[in-house]
Amino acid sequence: MQTHIKINRGELLRGIEQDHTRQLPDFRPGDTVRVDTKVREGNRTRSQAFEGVVIAINGSGSRKSFTVRKISFGEGVERVFPFASPLVNQVTIVERGKVRRAKLYYLRELRGKAARIKSDRSRVMKDAARAQQDKANASASQAAAAQADVTVISAAPEVAPETQGE
């Protein structure tokens, strides 16, 4: 007698991939980002920055990656970074860009001023407001923690003065 067990492979993969996902800032194609990566040279490691425009985001789950393009000494250079890579230390958003495409491969043919991307001021303002709100929440939680410490100290049982010296 054979029993067949049904396994939903998509659910199984999502469960495994959740362990490998990292929290990176929310960026889109058109944004200018600075990616700090670990570079190993011989027996020492150092950090190297790559700053450019995100021209594509590909894949999903643990296979998700993004492509960054910059112009270095007059030549276009593109690098693909996996989101889940342990070699990516940090991704910093330098500037928010306003584009109407998900893939910006057309930037490869453009040069100079034609390759510029408009700044998305509304997203910049939202980011600033979110950062200010996060700062306020952090200071409020610190104040609440300090208040909780004060109440714990004042709630300690007092020892009677006549039994203190014995």
Swiss-Prot record:
What is this protein's name?
Large ribosomal subunit protein bL19
Which family does the similarity line name? Answer: Belongs to the bacterial ribosomal protein bL19 family.
Keyword Repressor assigned: no
Sum up the protein's function in the record's words: This protein is located at the 30S-50S ribosomal subunit interface and may play a role in the structure and function of the aminoacyl-tRNA binding site. Binds the 23S rRNA.
- Which keywords does the record carry? Ribonucleoprotein, Ribosomal protein, RNA-binding, rRNA-binding
Could you tell me the gene encoding this protein? Answer: rplS
Q: Could you give a single Gene Ontology term from the biological process aspect?
A: translation
Name the Pfam families on file: Ribosomal_L19
How does the record describe its quaternary structure? Answer: Part of the 50S ribosomal subunit. Forms a cluster with proteins L3 and L14.
